[in-house]
Amino acid sequence: MSRYRGPRLRVVRRLGELPGLSRKTPRRAYPPGQHGQGRRKRSEYAIRLEEKQKLLYNYGVTEKQLVRYMKKARRSTDSTGQKLLELLEMRLDNTVFRLGMAGTIPGARQLVNHGHVIVNGRVVNIASYQCRPGDVISVRNKDNSRRMVETNMQYPGLANLPDHLEFDKNTLTGKVNDVIKREWVALQINELLVVEYYSRKV
């Protein structure tokens, strides 16, 4: 599937809270559509598929990208599910979002793609760039870049800064001190179901 650009609240109603996709919460707590309030029992496959879709929509990655991350996670000696989440969380667009420089991951991706973000003194416009401990992330020293980030910081997507990051609001500079721990992943997800979903596909 390609990257989603449709109504975000519709997806949130179907899959539940997706902090990276939207700050808004739907007025109706049931899925959209004529049969949204039905209580049909879902199959195990449908449940695993839904967990996978949470990752796709929350992090704004394509199916092809997620498969690539899954293959990389499997090669790790760590838990496959936790490594998968780590790879997604340590993307530059998500890190910019978690630093509070953008209210959503799509907003953070736009900042990165348009060259407003600097990593270790150089402009990096690749949203999938994997941040590593020691990376210093700052805003390009241009009025419009700083103004955009300062405006975004007034409406942060998430209230708490993860403990693997630090951020100086005066200089608009953040630093990655470690890889993210599982308990700091904001998305409510059962990553083991995603691993099971791909077990016969990848």
Swiss-Prot record:
Q: Has the keyword Transferase been applied to this entry?
A: no
Domain S4 RNA-binding stretches:
90-152
Residue ranges of the region described as Disordered: 16-43
Q: Which InterPro entries match?
A: Ribosomal_uS4 (IPR022801), Ribosomal_uS4_bac-type (IPR005709), Ribosomal_uS4_CS (IPR018079), Ribosomal_uS4_N (IPR001912), S4_RNA-bd (IPR002942), S4_RNA-bd_sf (IPR036986)
PROSITE patterns from the entry? RIBOSOMAL_S4, S4
As for what it does, the entry says:
One of the primary rRNA binding proteins, it binds directly to 16S rRNA where it nucleates assembly of the body of the 30S subunit. With S5 and S12 plays an important role in translational accuracy.
Which terms in the GO cellular component ontology are assigned? small ribosomal subunit
Which keywords appear in this protein's UniProt record, sorted alphabetically? Ribonucleoprotein, Ribosomal protein, RNA-binding, rRNA-binding
Protein's name in the database:
Small ribosomal subunit protein uS4
Gene3D superfamilies documented for this protein: Ribosomal Protein S4 Delta 41, Chain A, domain 1 (1.10.1050.10), RNA-binding S4 domain (3.10.290.10)
GO biological process terms, semicolon-separated: ribosomal small subunit biogenesis; translation
Organism the protein comes from: Crocosphaera subtropica (strain ATCC 51142 / BH68)
Q: Which family does it belong to?
A: Belongs to the universal ribosomal protein uS4 family.
**GO-annotated molecular function:** rRNA binding; structural constituent of ribosome
A Pfam entry, by short name: Ribosomal_S4
Which SMART domains does the protein's record reference? Ribosomal_S4, S4
Task: Describe the subunit structure.
Answer: Part of the 30S ribosomal subunit. Contacts protein S5. The interaction surface between S4 and S5 is involved in control of translational fidelity.
Q: State if Iron is listed as a keyword.
A: no
